[in-house]
């Protein structure tokens, strides 16, 4: 039986070969999924992938791009939105 801390869904099983041709199980923390655009669902560049504990240690400029809606929308969607707002203004 695995220890209770390894039964969580946030742990990932990794099988390793040990000397003597026996296999053992290592447990690793799963990575967070990649950030996606809120409008079109495209993957966002410049946004780190990791657990919240790891991301809080990064500087503010390393967490997301320094532009309007950086980290939430992709550049194409931001451009479309700004053009649409300028035309309706």
Curated annotation (Swiss-Prot):
Key words of the record: Ribonucleoprotein, Ribosomal protein
Keyword Protease on entry: no
Gene Ontology annotations for the cellular component aspect, listed alphabetically: ribonucleoprotein complex; ribosome
GO molecular function, one term: structural constituent of ribosome
GO biological process: translation
Family matches, as Pfam families: Ribosomal_L34e
Region (Disordered): 1-22
Membership in a protein family: Belongs to the eukaryotic ribosomal protein eL34 family.
PANTHER family cross-referenced by the UniProt entry: 60S RIBOSOMAL PROTEIN L34 (PTHR10759)
Protein's name in the database: Large ribosomal subunit protein eL34
Gene it is expressed from: rpl34e
């Amino acid at each position: 039986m695995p220890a209770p801390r390894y039964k969580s869904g946030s742990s990932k099983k990794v099988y390793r070969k040990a000397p003597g041709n026996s296999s053992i199980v290592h447990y690793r923390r799963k990575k967070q999924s990649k950030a996606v655009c809120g409008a079109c669902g495209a993957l966002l560049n410049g946004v780190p992938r990791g657990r919240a504990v790891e991301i809080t240690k990064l500087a503010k400029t390393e967490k997301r791009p320094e532009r309007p809606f950086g980290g939430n929308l992709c550049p194409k969607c931001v451009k479309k939105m700004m053009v649409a707002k300028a035309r309706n203004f």
